[in-house]
């Protein structure tokens, strides 16, 4: 079987230019020195780095932990406030009138720029409104808003008074919303009359009403932001529902709210993520360690400079939006672009228009978006300038080498380093990444660990793989890091069982990885996405990377399905680029490519031409659904309303039924 790294990387190393290195926030030499210190003397390293934040009171101990039993405390006894670190610290400096949030609406004619002082003023006022409705330190506030500035203002206002925010992505169904309300038991809900996505209205207030009707929890207060202005279809309950703008315009409302002094280990937010059991997990993050992780990674990974305009395309409903649209940028005094729309509206040049409109210097997006835009060709890109860009980033899933090369050549014009970042909702901040002026990149590799992070590969018996050279295993983290989650909200047992029980003494990420001869890490996909073919473990990401090497293929998703002889067979869903005709010749080409790049053991048993893939609105492929369809199970697919395009599922089922007949 050929070296499987051939699938994940073209054999080349891309080093930063001399100019980029000269001006970078860190050199390779300094990275190695600081990384060594962060592992060998974490107390000294993190005590020094924690001074990046403003503390009302210093901690009594940097770190205490019983890691194998999932018990970790950072900066215990230290007092700070997140909104103070994101806003107050800047308004007595020249940053007061610097753009903090640059908002671009779904409709290209709509935009707003809020300075640090603007955001500070709005956050203080809304914090006082929350207090007026009885929200106290430790209470939960559920936030179900579109990507508008009021979303950032709301979560910062929660942090100001010590309330725990739980943002639910605006694309989730009333049922999904209800399950989160039942779990976190919020004192108050903040929503909007509706929103816009791709030129189409989306229901928000109506979904909240439906969720509250079915919920066991009796939420007494719903604050509604006016976004669409369409009140005709709204159901309004006096004494429960209140307009945001009406409350904010109250002349008696105080313009200042004293920030609550929070212990470093006080809860900051709950963010729900999918669990293997189907019930969403409320990932709980705390104040000090999380903010330090977001702050420090943002500074080094994105090589941020005072004059930069930075754009993370993620929705705040996901952890990437929390850490790298709000908390990381604002605690560093950066200008952060916030985008309500989608990359394809009003046309496939929208991302590039926004970059040119605001002179974006740093652009952070997902491989799914990159591949979708690759499919549209170069016409939209050639009409744009894009010369303001100096750094590109990728997040959410491994980026296949073809997409990496396209991104580097066509968007970065061959001059912008790409930081391919690996991390999770649970980790809070970036864990494995290139530092752009220090670490040479390899297309498809997340590269090396960030400070304080000890990634290890563990075999199925729980033994750490220490061999030099190229090895594969289960990706685990050895030892605590500041921004790690502290628990599953309301379910401490589940926290230990999910992350610490499988490999004793390690945090198990759920991902498989390969470490090459240079120590670079290559994420090979979820371990539950590994297909066991005749006793051979085949990573779905490896087969997918081989399939998308073909110039006709836009995207591929590979899952296992029951096979009478092999135990599991390989089922490949393949989406082709526009204008490409699907036929047996192309099918044979794809099978041949997989055989050539991995081996005959990895050849797909089925190639299913797919009009699209079922994805969440954040771009995550729902492999659970694909596995069921591949196995001929068309019932019990779960709530598909959260998908970006639910109709894709029905089309895939119809195609599969034709195969059977």
From Swiss-Prot:
Task: List this protein's GO terms for biological process.
Answer: acetyl-CoA biosynthetic process from acetate
State its Enzyme Commission number(s).
6.2.1.1
Which enzyme class? ligase
Instruction: Quote the record's binding site residues for ATP.
Output: 396-398, 420-425, 511, 526, 537
Please describe what this protein does: Catalyzes the conversion of acetate into acetyl-CoA (AcCoA), an essential intermediate at the junction of anabolic and catabolic pathways. AcsA undergoes a two-step reaction. In the first half reaction, AcsA combines acetate with ATP to form acetyl-adenylate (AcAMP) intermediate. In the second half reaction, it can then transfer the acetyl group from AcAMP to the sulfhydryl group of CoA, forming the product AcCoA.
Classification lineage:
Bacteria, Pseudomonadati, Spirochaetota, Spirochaetia, Leptospirales
Give the family this protein belongs to, as stated in its UniProt record. Belongs to the ATP-dependent AMP-binding enzyme family.
User: After translation, how is this protein modified?
Assistant: Acetylated. Deacetylation by the SIR2-homolog deacetylase activates the enzyme.
Q: What organism is listed for this UniProt entry? A: Leptospira interrogans serogroup Icterohaemorrhagiae serovar copenhageni (strain Fiocruz L1-130)
Name what cofactor the protein needs. Answer: Mg(2+)
List residues binding CoA.
197-200, 320, 534
Q: Which UniProt keywords apply?
A: Acetylation, ATP-binding, Ligase, Magnesium, Metal-binding, Nucleotide-binding
Residues holding Mg(2+): 548, 553
The name this protein carries in UniProt is: Acetyl-coenzyme A synthetase
Q: Which PANTHER family match?
A: ACETYL-COENZYME A SYNTHETASE, ACETYL-COENZYME A SYNTHETASE 1
InterPro entries in the cross-refs: Ac_CoA_lig, ACAS_N, AMP-bd_C, AMP-bd_C_sf, AMP-binding_CS, AMP-dep_synth/lig_dom, ANL_N_sf
């Amino acid at each position: 079987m050929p070296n499987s790294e051939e699938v994940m990387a073209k054999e080349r190393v891309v080093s930063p230019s001399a100019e980029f290195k000269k001006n970078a926030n860190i050199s390779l030499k300094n990275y190695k020195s600081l990384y060594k210190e962060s592992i060998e003397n974490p107390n000294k390293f993190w005590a020094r780095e924690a001074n990046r934040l403003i503390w009302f009171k210093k901690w009594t101990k940097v770190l205490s932990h019983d890691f194998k039993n999932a018990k970790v405390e950072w900066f215990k006894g230290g007092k700070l406030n997140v909104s103070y670190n994101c806003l107050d610290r800047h308004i007595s400096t020249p940053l007061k009138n610097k753009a903090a949030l640059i908002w671009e609406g779904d409709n290209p004619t709509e935009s707003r720029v809020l300075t640090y002082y603007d955001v500070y003023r709005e956050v203080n006022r809304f914090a006082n409104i929350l207090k007026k409705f009885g929200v106290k330190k430790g209470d939960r506030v559920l936030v179900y808003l579109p990507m508008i500035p009021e979303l950032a203002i709301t979560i910062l206002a929660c942090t100001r008074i010590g309330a725990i925010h739980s943002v639910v992505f605006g694309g989730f169904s009333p049922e999904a919303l209800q399950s989160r309300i039942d779990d976190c038991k919020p004192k108050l809900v903040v929503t909007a009359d509706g929103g816009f996505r791709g030129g189409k209205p989306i229901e928000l207030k109506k979904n909240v009403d439906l969720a509250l009707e079915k919920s066991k929890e009796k939420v007494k207060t719903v604050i509604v932001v006016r976004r669409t202005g369409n009140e005709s279809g709204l159901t309004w309950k006096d004494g429960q529902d209140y307009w945001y703008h009406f409350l904010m315009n109250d002349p008696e409302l105080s313009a200042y709210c004293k920030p609550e002094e929070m212990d470093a280990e006080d809860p900051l937010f709950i963010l729900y993520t999918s669990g293997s059991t189907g019930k969403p997990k409320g990932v709980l993050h705390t104040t000090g360690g999380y903010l330090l992780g977001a702050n420090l990674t943002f500074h080094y990974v994105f090589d941020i400079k005072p004059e930069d305009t930075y754009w993370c395309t993620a929705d705040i409903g996901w952890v990437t939006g929390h850490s790298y649209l709000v908390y990381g940028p604002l605690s560093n005094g950066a200008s952060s672009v916030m985008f309500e729309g989608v990359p394809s509206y009003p046309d496939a040049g929208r991302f590039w228009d926004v970059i040119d409109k605001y002179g974006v210097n740093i652009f952070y997006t997902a491989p799914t978006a990159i591949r979708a835009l690759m499919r549209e060709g170069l016409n939209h890109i050639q009409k744009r300038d894009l010369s303001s860009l100096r750094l590109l980033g990728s997040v959410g899933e491994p980026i296949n080498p073809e997409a990496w090369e396209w991104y580097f050549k066509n968007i970065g014009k061959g001059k912008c380093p790409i930081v391919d970042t690996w991390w999770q909702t649970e980790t809070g901040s970036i864990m494995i990444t290139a530092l752009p002026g220090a670490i040479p990149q390899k297309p498809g590799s997340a590269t090396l660990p960030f400070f304080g992070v000890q990634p290890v590969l563990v075999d199925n018996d729980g033994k750490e793989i220490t061999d030099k050279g190229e090895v594969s295993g289960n990706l685990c983290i050895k030892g605590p890091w500041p921004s790690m989650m502290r628990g599953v909200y309301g379910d401490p047992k589940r926290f230990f069982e999910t992350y610490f029980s499988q490999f004793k003494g390690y945090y198990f990420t759920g991902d498989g990885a390969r470490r090459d001869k240079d120590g670079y890490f290559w994420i090979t996909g979820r371990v539950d996405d590994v297909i066991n073919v005749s006793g051979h473990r085949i990573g779905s990401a490896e087969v997918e990377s081989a399939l998308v090497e073909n110039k006709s293929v836009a995207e591929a998703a590979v899952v296992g399905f029951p096979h009478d002889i092999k135990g599991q067979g390989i089922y490949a869903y393949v989406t082709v680029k526009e204008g490409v005709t699907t036929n047996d010749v192309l099918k044979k080409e794809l099978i041949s490519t997989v055989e050539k790049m991995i081996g005959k053991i990895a050849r797909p048993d089925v190639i299913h031409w797919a009009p699209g893939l079922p994805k969440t609105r954040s771009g995550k492929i729902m492999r659970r659904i694909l596995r069921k369809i591949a196995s001929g199970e068309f019932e019990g697919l779960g709530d598909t309303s959260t998908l970006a395009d639910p109709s894709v599922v029905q089309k895939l089922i119809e195609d599969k039924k034709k195969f059977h007949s």
